[in-house]
Structure formats: structure tokens, C-alpha cells
Amino acid sequence: MCATPVSPTPLPATAPLALRWRGTEPYEASFEAMRAFTDGRTAETPDEIWLVEHPPVFTLGQAGDPAHLLAADSGIPLVKVDRGGQITYHGPGQVVAYLLLDLRRRKLMVRELVTRIEQAVIDTLAAYNLAGERKAGAPGIYVAPGPAAGSHAGAKIAALGLKIRNGCSYHGVSLNVNMDLRPFLAINPCGYAGLETVDMATLGVTAGWNDVARTFAACLTANLDGSPAAVAQPQAGALTA
């Protein structure tokens, strides 16, 4: 947890973010790791962004309704977690960013954090000539009407869910890059029946996971603290093609 500092010199609010590339990792491993990271925090612990890609998995938020899983025999595991929100899907071709932040140190309210995360998604999409927009009361980012949207205006392209514990955040945001979208048909995405889910590839973007992940990381960092991330070099094989 975010404990009382041992030393009288905690990190300043402007301490740089550290970026961790975790590669392809089972969801449960990421979930356990971010909880452990948050539980072990002190006032001196630097904030981090983790970028990861998961094998197929459905996750259900702490107040989620299992009835939103429409096909229990899909063969895809369901993991109940402690974030906000309903049910969503993670799978190959999706960039997931986990945001491990000390909100008190950053003097951030939860609503402002959500707004900054959403803006980072919008900025990332704009880098590939796509337009994203918010919807009131429905966290996440949706495809805005326009030439690039085609028939997919209003479709959800990024999902967001957070947990705040002792003033620190974990969980985060997922951006659909180039996925098999069929598993989304087995759920009511984020609890909305009939909501279309789309990815960047469907909208004509040819960039791969690595390229989009780097752009997304830069946009998240810029929106969170306005400075470049302290980037940990990925290990061999840590980034997917």
C-alpha cells in the first residue's frame, strides 16, 4: 500500500514514470503482480506504466453481473477481479496498459485521471488518423463519426477500468489494435447489450502492436505528467510482432 514514508524526502509529484514492457503474459500473472506492487508501495515508490498483451480471457469487475457473459461454453476463461466496471475481453492484438500511480502524490482526483487516460487514447488514435470520442456515463473511447469510421461510428475501441486502494491506482486501459473480435460477441461489452466493438485494423490502420504500444505509452506519459517516460528497455522477445 502507499505507506507513510520512511524517509522525510518522498518523491516529488513530477517524478518520471517508469515504463515496463511485460510482453505476452497470462492475465492472472499481471493481476497478482499489480496487486503485490500496490501493496508494497511506499511514498518513495516510483509510478509505473506496464504494457502487456494477454492470451484470451474475459474479466468481470467487482460489481459486474455474470449474466453479461452470454456464452459460458466459449472456452475462454472468466476471471473475477477487483476493478470497476462490468465484463470485458482481453486477447492477442490488444495493447493493455496498467497504471500504477500514487494519486495523492500527483494530486489527481479519480475523475481527472480517467479524463487524462481517455485523452491519451484519443491522442493515440489521432496519430493514426482516427477520431475517438467519449460518451457520458460510459468510460472508454468510442469511434467518432467521420470518413475513417465508415459504418463503425459509435463502436467501442478502448475499455477502461481502475481500482483505487490507499490512494494508489492499478488496473488500467485496453486499446484494440488488430484482434479476433469474435469473442466480444459472447459478452455484453462493459454491460451494454449489442454494443459493437472494433479495432484499429478494421478502420484501416496497418501499424502493428509494437508501434501502437510505443505511441500509446508516449501519449499516456504526456497526458499524465507532460514529460517523456523513463523507459525500461524491453527484454529479447518481450514485444510481440
From Swiss-Prot:
Pfam families: LplA-B_cat. One of its GO terms (cellular component) is cytoplasm. GO terms for molecular function: lipoyl(octanoyl) transferase activity. Residues 43-228 form the BPL/LPL catalytic domain. GO terms for biological process: protein modification process. Belongs to the LipB family. This is Octanoyltransferase. The gene is lipB.
